Amino acid sequence: KNGLLSTNLKSNRGIIHKDIANNEIQHRRSEMRVTCGPGGVVHDYVPFYFTKRSPMLLNVIKKKNVDQEGIIYLAIPIEAIEDKSVVFSNSSANTLTPPTFYSNADDLNKLNWDAIDSRVWIPKTEGVKQQKMAELLIHDEIPFNNFSFIVVWNLCVKTHVAQLLKKYGFNNFDVRCDSRSFDHHYFHDLNVVGRVNIVTGPKILLAKTKKYISDIKQNKPLNPRFKNIADVLEAISNNFGCIKELSDIDGLETDNPIHREDVGAHSRRVASLLNTESAFHDLSERERLVVTLAAYLHDIGKGPKSRWKDGVQKVDDTHPIKSLPMLKRILCEEIGDLSNREIRQIVTLVVYDDLVGDIIAHERNEEQMQKIIKIKSDVDMLILIAKCDMNSINTAWVKDGIDKIEELRARMYTYLEENL
């Protein structure tokens, strides 16, 4: 409908859309002068990368605020650089020190093409990382018919995009989702076959979580091995490996430098720390049982040991979604006398165990928390899991972040009072 517009032109026309950009970087770009071509500031231009897969996008995806499956790439022909309205830079226009800007295509050889074309996700040095993100900047706007092709995640997204294009009169537009285009543009798990995201985005995680909660509610065990939560907790305290998924993480070493213990030992420590928190004792007896079970189970998605080379777990941003089928097996086969609320809470606490920490320290958005809480104790238990998880690794994290944690609690309470 509008093609692509510069930030300033978009603002002048009152066009609003979902923004995944970093505010601090955008402020820099709003003031950074472009020293050639039409001049002005970076926000007077529509930016493109020369590289197919940028460290900036990886950083955005790692914050868990967007689903990479919904990211599309718009490509323009390199000949666009010959237009007088186009400039380019030898590195990103994101840092405190501006890049060098050029308006003569003969200066393209001054860019670090080895870095730009490299398949390495993040170069080892900051300077090379910024050079990899050299930009082509088109003044004001670019009409949609100037694009060469679009790259999308898969055939499903291709169909959706093609329908949108047809709605606006673009029939038979070149939308690509072939394996080579996918491999070159998206951050995917290189250890498995297929199109597997390295981070589960918020929409997919929420949808999967809701589906599994519903499935578990409809398939409560008829002959559970443990009659209730208290029964299974007693068994775990006597034998941590009494549940297969716990046995599969017991002794699982990790190469994550912030962890001092194996995954099983860490899970036991998190559960033991609950008793040190006053908020834990403010919960009802049933809720204390729920959050304790969730603490034991919160890292089961990192297992089993058998999936890791030499039994050493690597950082895995998809472990929350991997826990869902495990939770379904445990709650549908092992544990009886669970209410629907308790099923929802256990699953939510395990899948979103990192949510509070990510919100206060890594810019994960609060809307994700709003979508999973129903009552105040949901908030309290999510915070309990987070605090005990952080304290088990580094007590300074909680000490330094306690004000932000309590402010988050207050905002979630207010949200519940106003909306539910």
Region roles according to the model:
Residues V60, S85-V87, A162-Q163, R307, ...:
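Short conserved micro-motifs at the rims of enzyme active sites and ligand-binding pockets
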Residues F48, H259-V270, D316-S323:
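Phosphate/oxyanion-binding active-site loops and adjacent basic polyanion-contact surfaces
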Residues L382-A386, M390-L420:
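Charged substrate- and nucleic-acid-binding regions of tRNA-handling and nucleotidyl-transfer enzymes
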Residues R260, G264, Q313, V398, ...:
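Conserved phosphate/pyrophosphate-binding and hydrolysis machinery centered on Walker-type P-loop NTPases
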Residues K1-P47, P55-K220:
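Active-site-proximal loop/hinge segments that shape catalytic or ion-binding/gating pockets
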Residues L205-K309:
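Acidic/His-rich, divalent-metal-binding segments that scaffold phosphate/diphosphate chemistry
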Residues S284-I393:
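Divalent metal-dependent catalytic cores for phosphoryl transfer on phosphate-bearing substrates
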